[in-house]
Curated annotation (Swiss-Prot):
Stated role: Required for replicative DNA synthesis. This DNA polymerase also exhibits 3' to 5' exonuclease activity.
Listed name of the protein: DNA polymerase III PolC-type
Lineage: Bacteria, Bacillati, Bacillota, Bacilli, Bacillales
Reaction(s) this enzyme catalyzes, per UniProt: DNA(n) + a 2'-deoxyribonucleoside 5'-triphosphate = DNA(n+1) + diphosphate
Protein's cellular compartments: Cytoplasm
EC number: 2.7.7.7
Protein family per UniProt: Belongs to the DNA polymerase type-C family. PolC subfamily.
Pfam families in UniProt: DNA_pol3_a_NI, DNA_pol3_a_NII, DNA_pol3_alpha, DNA_pol3_finger, HHH_6, PHP, RNase_T
Keywords: Cytoplasm, DNA replication, DNA-directed DNA polymerase, Exonuclease, Hydrolase, Nuclease, Nucleotidyltransferase, Transferase
Amino acid sequence: MAMTEQQKFKVLADQIKISNQLDAEILNSGELTRIDVSNKNRTWEFHITLPQFLAHEDYLLFINAIEQEFKDIANVTCRFTVTNGTNQDEHAIKYFGHCIDQTALSPKVKGQLKQKKLIMSGKVLKVMVSNDIERNHFDKACNGSLIKAFRNCGFDIDKIIFETNDNDQEQNLASLEAHIQEEDEQSARLATEKLEKMKAEKSKQQDNNESAVDKCQIGKPIQIENIKPIESIIEEEYKVAIEGVIFDINLKELKSGRHIVEIKVTDYTDSLVLKMFTRKNKDDLEHFKALSVGKWVRAQGRIEEDTFIRDLVMMMSDIEEIKKATKKDKAEEKRVEFHLHTAMSQMDGIPNIGAYVKQAADWGHPAIAVTDHNVVQAFPDAHAAAEKHGIKMIYGMEGMLVDDGVPIAYKPQDVVLKDATYVVFDVETTGLSNQYDKIIELAAVKVHNGEIIDKFERFSNPHERLSETIINLTHITDDMLVDAPEIEEVLTEFKEWVGDAIFVAHNASFDMGFIDTGYERLGFGPSTNGVIDTLELSRTINTEYGKHGLNFLAKKYGVELTQHHRAIYDTEATAYIFIKMVQQMKELGVLNHNEINKKLSNEDAYKRARPSHVTLIVQNQQGLKNLFKIVSASLVKYFYRTPRIPRSLLDEYREGLLVGTACDEGELFTAVMQKDQSQVEKIAKYYDFIEIQPPALYQDLIDRELIRDTETLHEIYQRLIHAGDTAGIPVIATGNAHYLFEHDGIARKILIASQPGNPLNRSTLPEAHFRTTDEMLNEFHFLGEEKAHEIVVKNTNELADRIERVVPIKDELYTPRMEGANEEIRELSYANARKLYGEDLPQIVIDRLEKELKSIIGNGFAVIYLISQRLVKKSLDDGYLVGSRGSVGSSFVATMTEITEVNPLPPHYICPNCKTSEFFNDGSVGSGFDLPDKTCETCGAPLIKEGQDIPFETFLGFKGDKVPDIDLNFSGEYQPNAHNYTKVLFGEDKVFRAGTIGTVAEKTAFGYVKGYLNDQGIHKRGAEIDRLVKGCTGVKRTTGQHPGGIIVVPDYMDIYDFTPIQYPADDQNSAWMTTHFDFHSIHDNVLKLDILGHDDPTMIRMLQDLSGIDPKTIPVDDKEVMQIFSTPESLGVTEDEILCKTGTFGVPEFGTGFVRQMLEDTKPTTFSELVQISGLSHGTDVWLGNAQELIKTGICDLSSVIGCRDDIMVYLMYAGLEPSMAFKIMESVRKGKGLTEEMIETMKENEVPDWYLDSCLKIKYMFPKAHAAAYVLMAVRIAYFKVHHPLYYYASYFTIRASDFDLITMIKDKTSIRNTVKDMYSRYMDLGKKEKDVLTVLEIMNEMAHRGYRMQPISLEKSQAFEFIIEGETLIPPFISVPGLGENVAKRIVEARDDGPFLSKEDLNKKAGLSQKIIEYLDELGSLPNLPDKAQLSIFDM
């Protein structure tokens, strides 16, 4: 169904990524009515109808976004029509400057015109000018273009009148005449230059008919005949010319002020680094900036050895950007690709789907399919790419099809196993295909009553030379077969010898295939004898075995196998193994041949089946959901080494799917190799289409001698085509693409080579690039022009036409339903507000609650709040505090529902008794915690201090319609409980972990590339290695799960409406299933709960357990606690003793070197200043080069600099700006977008100081104040214990937060510890990560020691497995703190100790499993006093 104009506008808004910026009414009602395209001029004009004017800043955002999106395709313009033009006069004033910029006036005159006053009267716009000359000049120069500019913006304007203000005429006359004269001179100069440039370009094109583009051009033109391949550059040369495509670029400014550009280019023979410095008085820098990745350049210069990178580089003298001819699809009718692998085909496909889609669109293909191996993880990106490039997307997958149960016994006979006669046989052949290869040896033994009673062994003459592979495998030579009988004679004799015995073979389907084919060619028809396959029998009755090959089984059963792959020896070994298997079957109750399959079948039978590749194509939306179900089942229920699709599963969910035969690993291709045509045609009827792939892709089958030669391959194609014709299903040519272009194939080779067990390593990888229609037609030219066109073009297009438009991703949010959520959130909010503020609520509380509840309930967000409230309440009830993250603390409703402890109201007092309150709304107080202590004037009770002054808008947006993202920090040890509680709330089938996709990282790719080059004995320069690394980076390597993300499916839908499911990293033992799609793909469609694990709540819980102090009762403004953020005095130590000017070692958020330096620079004394520090330390370009300089120069102090994003909105509102403008400025600054002219003007009008504007312009990212406040609250509570309960603090810190210990140093005296710390500081730049982690622990230990406490050695009698324990004024470390000692060993020591004391080191080793190295460490530590090496035998032990 065609999209409506409104839907087209939504798609456009999504594509250019501004949906979230637009007003909801505009987004929902806007229409994209048409696009005028001029291929000749490369222009697109979008015609858009809107219900109202866009705000000026939104208009500029829209124009910029659409121009950027399509800049590589066309020059874009927009024409807007506004249906409701109310307030046209107000908008005209704001748009005036933009419209002037669309005229051809000089910059100076434009600037002057922008200062003019506007008057709008109906459809006439009056511009007040200073004099008649101005009026005439402007009217002549820009009237028409200015009207056009306004109309393009949607204004209904008939004319523009320039009117004079007589009072100003004379004053401005002289100035204007000078401007006009300057403009005329400049226009003449520009016209002359343009004419000369056109002449030069025309002359150049006549002399050198190339497609060079005059963009980057430095130095002299480079003669094309001088170009040489990069691979030929092997030593220093004076002057060399090359051309290549840029794949990396780095532009740096030097201390001298000059710039150097370093680009890496490749011509796909090799790669090279090119360098060039800017020259004096030249515009080289602008040319350098014109270069970008993907552009082709021609360069000339000197090749020299770069001593820094130790490689050859080119120092360029000349460079020019060129336009390189790209690969084209020249066919009039284009094909459709139905078999294609992206980077989501694990360690196999190379490009992302977007690259394929763009290429297909560039070639003019009407549609393209994606069929990754076993997964559909490219679907979300495929949808976005198809929408962007205007091409039909076909969604599919190449899966692994298995029969539900592989029979052990064929053609069941009513024969008692112990009484039966068996013929155990084996064939040796010229190849693997019973249709195209021949038997060269047939050997058998006859078994009865558990004994071999007869033998049969014959060679047969194949009348062809044996390949080296077969000779090496079977040890049969041509000479041995020269005088051998014909196969007809051998088989006739064999059939008579067998009689009615039961056939037994190892992998019987192979051997019986040759026997039955031979029988049929002799006219006997297929064998009617019963069959038993010992391979499948072993897989069933020996499930504990990981292998079931004949070699392996012979060893397990104690049977001698003297010469494997000679028929008679294999046969005898199989016979003796089978005799023992019959006894096993008897013990399992299997007594008759016809009972084998029934009694030995099990639900894991799918694991025994050999998978065949199958292509599944989604035909409609129902098919998409069914494919999601199939994918999920294959990954969760039927995963065995690889995801498997039982045929019964496919049959159950086949509706809406088209089933294809896939590649040479497919069932039908195998059938052509192993079965006669009637059986092939029978199998073909199961499928909806047959795939045949280019002969080049099957070359490895010929190389591996699985197919005899090209002639045989062509015969296989004919049989496949005939099967399609007979079955009445289309035969289509598919490319099985794994990368875009031929030169990308090296990346796939590298990835495959990195997987030692991958079967693709056994042969040369075929060329699997994305082929054009021309290339595919050429591949199948041997079929004749008509047939080639039919399978390549006609059938692929007709099949594509049968497929409906499918959308794999939802376009809106689906939240769970909880009965009465709206009412409960409202009631809970007011109930807790009344508990805190009294029955007669202050108006400020009512106003804030109503404002928030209107947004929360009105937009359907109450259920999200209620879920979070339930999770937090459960954790609190279980004794664990929860810290909030992000901006949820901006919501007062979240505070009143106990989701967060942060109170966002302005600072205020509350009386806990009579509930009187006092609010400070003028910005004079940064945090309620900073208010001075005060008693209630009414009842005398000490007042509660609250409020962080955070606007609600920073959480749900200015309109309150942004989906709430509630992130919660649970204790790390409680997190699994919180996760599992979601199953209680919603049901196990409604909650899943948020899935992630792990791709090959750059460092990993580097290892792959180096390994491949070393294995191949190839040397490449560094630039080429970098290129190969880039080619391998980003390919899917594994899957995983978000550390805390839980996806909640609403009760009225199921998970398959959104995504398939799987286990993370395919770990079938995982406790949770995850979304198959990366959670970012469905983030806007389903609710994601961020239930994160954090150390702070865990530490608070341990401190509470040790001290009995409720952390919520800890005073937040304790003076001694506040003191440690500027001096260590309250800890009773000096700066010199602990080598630090603050006392914040180990305090969350304030213990790192970077933040400690901030504390030294700012010396905070209040809670609000600590919040500032937290915001400053988490922001980007907020502290360094910004607030730090403002404080140092004395322009402002810590409390007044911009620290958190919310500060901007609050500050600007207090300064007098409208809340909407204050919000816009905050959002623009926090996203690093700076300030618009309108914002700057508004801020200046309200006397915002210049330093504040400058600070805003520097910021790239800002931290939410609510997040900072929550972090600081936790930090202050932990700091309280550090100051007032030191041993509780240190025990908790070392237990929860520390991981790397140097116990040898920690048990020493304080002077020794300090010296070690000081020494490590002196070597800091040379320390590794582990050493730096040890240093962090030693800093805390040094502080602890100087406070008078010490660390004991490990105690065999007292140490716990994981927790530091307090003994007097000391701590005893746990066993886990011993370097190299793991969790299981730590537990085992405690368990062994509980069973009795350790008698010796030998006893310790034996009982606890301690290594000699660990025992020696404990000995050095002094933990094994008087423990002998071996126990002495006592008379009492006798």
